[in-house]
Amino acid sequence: MRPAAAKVPKWLLLALSALLPQWPAASAWELTILHTNDVHSRLEQTSDDSTKCLNASLCVGGVARLFTKVQQIRKEEPNVLFLDAGDQYQGTIWFTVYKGLEVAHFMNILGYDAMALGNHEFDNGVEGLIDPLLRNVKFPILSANIKARGPLAHQISGLFLPSKVLSVGGEVVGIVGYTSKETPFLSNPGTNLVFEDEISALQPEVDKLKTLNVNKIIALGHSGFEMDKLIAQKVRGVDIVVGGHSNTFLYTGNPPSKEVPAGKYPFIVTADDGRQVPVVQAYAFGKYLGYLKVEFDDKGNVITSYGNPILLNSSIPEDATIKADINQWRIKLDNYSTQELGRTIVYLDGSTQTCRFRECNMGNLICDAMINNNLRHPDEMFWNHVSMCIVNGGGIRSPIDEKNNGTITWENLAAVLPFGGTFDLVQLKGSTLKKAFEHSVHRYGQSTGEFLQVGGIHVVYDINRKPWNRVVQLEVLCTKCRVPIYEPLEMDKVYKVTLPSYLANGGDGFQMIKDELLKHDSGDQDISVVSEYISKMKVVYPAVEGRIKFSAASHYQGSFPLVILSFWAMILILYQ
């Protein structure tokens, strides 16, 4: 008779198993995801702040450098997907001239596997998306929450998809796309595209992939970091979220450049069903290449995820063939920069002496262009969704003379707006706007850059008052009205304002805007906005209209010292 086997206590088995090394399952599969978002026409390398490259040794990004890094990773690693989360369009002269053809050409060369539609892909209307991009790319473009109707439904059918199943290293991976449902307020998609709620549209598409036995699913889209996190939490079956739109920088450890991380990379969201879902973005402007490693078990569950954005600095060489191609395409840009956009029949005063002290007609022209660029008709209750513009006087760097036929070229505008920023859309409470206008004149008379030029706003200052109490009157143009009129600013009301990205990020001391903004959507390149407005108008003649006034007691405050000096100089001359 065999002796009975001694029973080992459960607690001892658990303790021993905890001490044993945890080897990954034999069927575990690893995927490398390379990703970009919000590149905004930065085909050439740029300076560290994404403006024009002035010192090549300090410059970053560009498609020639991106190509080098992507090719290196593809050679070294077996299972690689290269994805873009939208907004390749808009941002530099490249898009102004080529209107998306350059995007299709260089994205094809880079070998992207899929792209989600961003809001800026609609900036030139649906035709400006179909012909340059959708008909020319060699990879799928995705969005599950955009639905076409009417005649457009047939025209655009099959040119973009809700999802795509890709084969990678013997496995299948599903990609579902999404686009900000606010695109009709941010761009020009027309009336025959409906932008549905992202989560409601994604869930049935993910469910469909699940019925096809696709158990590894990436949500790729362009709705901002907050929506990315909600999708990770709410959409059952999504394993990874690759996002864009909010230009979010995530990083684990010490960041390699000046961007401050909004969280660790990847950012882990606990889904409602308990799964841990990695969420990533890669900042913007092609400065970084997102690099995410994900390990799946045989059921498609994420076991681990790790990585970091790769800074594309000068330590990574630019591919010579791509660089030569860029230079060839650039010839047309150089010719364009000297072509006439339109004419002015008045002097466009962009001088420091004017724009940092009082209303200047160059500031009025810029603000009029910014509001015109945001003309939408989203609701019969509103004539437009935004009526207000602010621009820091220090950002206006040059006048344009009406003499010599008053010709305005891209080069002229580059002298006026040399910093290569964007004109963005934010939502602010009235109380924040009031603080901004107090900041505008808190050290008035010192030729500082924070003095605001405006559109859709009437402001009256009394410079004799103490700083931070100098705004006497502040009125804003209504939007929910059939006949626009100026109404007193309400402190608790939320307003939409178009402004330079520099101000949205707290530049010139406008920290209250950065800290208190309720929403921030990136916009179009500053020069492009003004150039397109001038081209549309053909002839411009902006006036000084009384948008900015000073109370009678302080009207001559800025020039008072000069008046006194002139008086005493005259006395000396008379008595010599």
Curated annotation (Swiss-Prot):
Task: Recite the UniProt keywords alphabetically.
Answer: Cell membrane, Disulfide bond, Glycoprotein, GPI-anchor, Hydrolase, Lipoprotein, Membrane, Metal-binding, Nucleotide-binding, Signal, Zinc
A molecular-function term among this protein's GO annotations: nucleotide binding
Residues holding Zn(2+) 2: 38, 87, 119, 222, 245
Q: Where in the cell is it found?
A: Cell membrane
Entry comment describing in which tissues the protein is expressed? Expressed at high levels in the placenta, kidney, lung and stomach and at lower levels in the thymus, spleen, skeletal muscle and esophagus.
Propeptide residue intervals: 552-576
Report the record's disulfide bonds.
Answer: 53-59, 355-360, 367-389, 478-481
* Annotated residues for binding of AMP: 356, 392, 397, 419, 502, 508
Sites marked Transition state stabilizer: 120, 123
Q: What class of enzyme is it?
A: hydrolase
Known function: Catalyzes the hydrolysis of nucleotide monophosphates, releasing inorganic phosphate and the corresponding nucleoside. Hydrolyzes IMP. Shows a preference for ribonucleotide monophosphates over their equivalent deoxyribose forms. Although AMP is the preferred substrate can also hydrolyze UMP, GMP, CMP, dAMP, dCMP, dTMP, NAD and NMN.
By sequence similarity, the record places it as follows:
Belongs to the 5'-nucleotidase family.
Q: What is this protein called?
A: 5'-nucleotidase
Q: Which organism is it from?
A: Mus musculus (Mouse)
